[in-house]
Amino acid sequence: MIMLVKEFGAQHTWKRNITAMNAHRANSTPLLSSLLILLALIFLSTACTAPGGSTSSTFSPRTHPQAAATQPPAMVHIPSGPITYVALGASDAVGVGSDQPGSQGYVPLVAAHLPKGSHLVNLGITGERLHDALTEELPIALSTSPGLITVWLVANDFVDGVSYDAYIHDLNTLLEQLHTNSRASLVMANLPDLTRLPAFASLTSTQKAQMLAQIKRWNTGIATSAAHYSVRLVDLFNHGSQLTAHPEYISGDGFHPSPAGYVQLANIFWLAIQG
């Protein structure tokens, strides 16, 4: 946890624990290792594709809920008075790539738009995957009586080689819990076009095409789950070029936003929140 707009009182155990997790994961598995795993899984998934483009996998309703085609976009209601804003996420929520994560990340920048006196609970953990967030972030989020929850937990799962089926199952578990056990407005981001980032510049055109196809597949599943659980979607895939088209918006690691990039990212989130 990196910041609270207004403290909830004494230092909380969960605050200390999340700070420790971020410090521990700061030197986690290098991006190159994750990329190699990702490419191997993309190759396997492509090789297992049945004629006609369909895969051999079968999806149960629990894994891949069906949303009504005519279902309108989820509504986000921001009251005029103070609210508690909870951010579930990974290194981008922490603000990795910025000079001052506590104030320059997209989460505190989004929080700055909220009514005066609102509370920010940033549960972002560097290197976090969605499955881990079910036990490390979700219980805390539900305990804070939030009015707004943002979720961006997908890039690490995708790059680290988590299977599509496992990710969608965990995503539905998360969204079902948030939808059932809170009255918060829910906002969630999808995968941007990672092939446009400098970190993946060494990929061949074929590898980029395969990676892009998998990103689109994941985003289709994310959109279906978002519609099913009345979650407002932040479409970073279609709006991400606002970041990738400007080298100054990407940090030196070629993967995370720079301070200027986080400003743009926060604007994309806020526009989606406003509807």
Residue ranges and their predicted role:
Residues 135-275:
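Alpha-helical cap/lid subdomain in secreted, periplasmic
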Residues 45-47:
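C-terminal motif of bacterial Sec signal peptides marking the signal peptidase cleavage site
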Residues 59-126, 138-145:
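Serine-esterase "nucleophile elbow" of acetyl-processing enzymes
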